[in-house]
């Protein structure tokens, strides 16, 4: 009898899964495939070819893939390699609490190039969740603040985190729900193209983000000693601004961001910091039928751009830059090094740069599929994010752990709650 063993069959997306095939002839080429449908019905799929051992088994923790979407020993490769059938789609979970992704794992007892066209010898359907049992989601419409607050089970107080994404707009909750599953009170913060917020981001109104940080500090289940900020891309730029100007922010994680105000000017009361304009004429076509925006952002070292550099030396707490050195959207390693250099110049010693070789722009939570290119709602062409498959996915595993460890070390959390 041919079979598949998968453990665990119900898990969070950032948890590893063990996959074994058994009951096959020895030294036989087989095909393992995975697929799922997202909430809009789009299919994402992956496959790899293996050769069974002398006992007719394949163990993804030991057996190397001979080909397919990846090669070598890669226990999570079928999850990491999930790619869209419709070009330029990105796998994003929106209903993070109510339902999991159902991942269909299929075993074919021979080489199958188009595995879904034939009946598999064995199948398993597993659940991949974005929120642990007991995590609570609260939709936030408090003053001007719009978002979703995720609370771990228990009384707290919990370390608070403001969580933001980039220029995709809307409200993305999947990182916050996972952070809450790991013990953080995380506010997934929208800042444009959501609810009654502006459709387009015309300027960065720091008062809005200050209100969000204070809301989180004031929540009875969140420590009032300060909050962390986690953000990527344009959101990371805003996170660095928040760290530099807002006393509520005590720890900041910038994922592939910049070190200056770009495209949209910063407004904070009477303070106005003009942005460095994007150089749209520098968009570069790539082999992926998409465009690289690496050179869109002008050099902040130019004399005319000096006033736009973010004064991170004023930040109350430590700052961690997580960067992929194959980022094809931002020159993020350069920006991180410039930020660290400025901090050291002014005597701030708690700015850290963690660079991941061969990783691209979209450093997502562990277990997320590799997304080298996608099309967003606010850019007219598909964009290349960069990175190499295996190093990028391994970097996601590492940086997801480092991000949490950094936040736990640096967000002070009182022992008694405020209820």
What are these regions (language model features)?
Residues 170-174, 182, 210-282, 291-308, ...:
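Primarily recognizes the serine-hydrolase "nucleophile elbow" in alpha/beta-hydrolase
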């Amino acid at each position: 009898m041919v079979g598949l063993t998968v453990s665990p069959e119900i898990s969070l997306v950032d948890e590893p899964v063990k996959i074994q095939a058994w009951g096959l002839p020895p030294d036989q080429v087989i095909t393992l495939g995975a697929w799922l449908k997202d909430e809009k019905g789009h299919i994402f799929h992956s496959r790899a070819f293996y050769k069974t051992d002398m006992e007719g088994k394949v163990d993804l923790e030991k057996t190397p893939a001979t080909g397919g979407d990846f090669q070598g020993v890669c226990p999570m490769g079928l999850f990491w390699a999930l790619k869209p059938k419709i070009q330029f789609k990105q796998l994003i979970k929106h209903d993070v609490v109510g339902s999991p992704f159902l991942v269909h794992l299929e075993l074919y007892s021979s080489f199958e190039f188009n595995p879904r066209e034939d009946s598999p010898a064995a199948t398993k359907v597993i659940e991949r969740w974005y929120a642990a049992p007991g995590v609570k989601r609260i939709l936030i419409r408090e003053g001007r603040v719009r978002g979703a607050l995720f609370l771990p089970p228990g009384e707290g107080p919990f370390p608070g985190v403001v969580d933001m994404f980039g220029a995709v707009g809307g409200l993305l909750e999947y990182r916050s729900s996972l952070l809450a599953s790991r013990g953080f009170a995380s506010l997934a913060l929208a800042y444009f193209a959501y609810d009654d917020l502006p459709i387009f981001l015309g300027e960065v109104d720091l008062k809005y983000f200050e209100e969000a940080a204070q809301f989180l500090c004031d929540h009875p289940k969140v420590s009032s000693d300060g909050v962390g900020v986690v953000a990527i891309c344009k959101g990371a730029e805003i996170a660095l601004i928040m760290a530099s100007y807002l006393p509520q922010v005590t720890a900041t994680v910038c994922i592939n961001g910049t070190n200056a105000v770009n495209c949209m000017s910063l407004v904070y009361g009477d303070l106005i910091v003009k942005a460095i304009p994007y150089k749209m004429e520098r968009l570069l076509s790539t082999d992926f039928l998409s465009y690289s925006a690496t050179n869109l952002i002008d050099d902040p070292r130019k004399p005319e751009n000096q006033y736009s550099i973010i004064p991170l030396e004023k930040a109350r707490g430590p700052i961690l830059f997580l960067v992929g050195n194959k980022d094809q959207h931002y020159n993020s390693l350069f920006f991180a090094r410039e930020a660290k250099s400025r901090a050291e110049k002014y005597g701030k010693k708690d700015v850290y740069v963690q660079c991941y070789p061969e990783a691209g722009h979209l450093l997502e939570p562990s277990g997320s599929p590799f997304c080298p290119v996608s099309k967003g709602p606010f850019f007219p062409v598909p964009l290349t994010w960069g990175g190499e498959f295996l190093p990028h996915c391994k970097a996601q595993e590492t940086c997801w752990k480092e991000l949490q460890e950094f936040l736990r070390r640096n967000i002070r959390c009182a022992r008694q709650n405020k209820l």
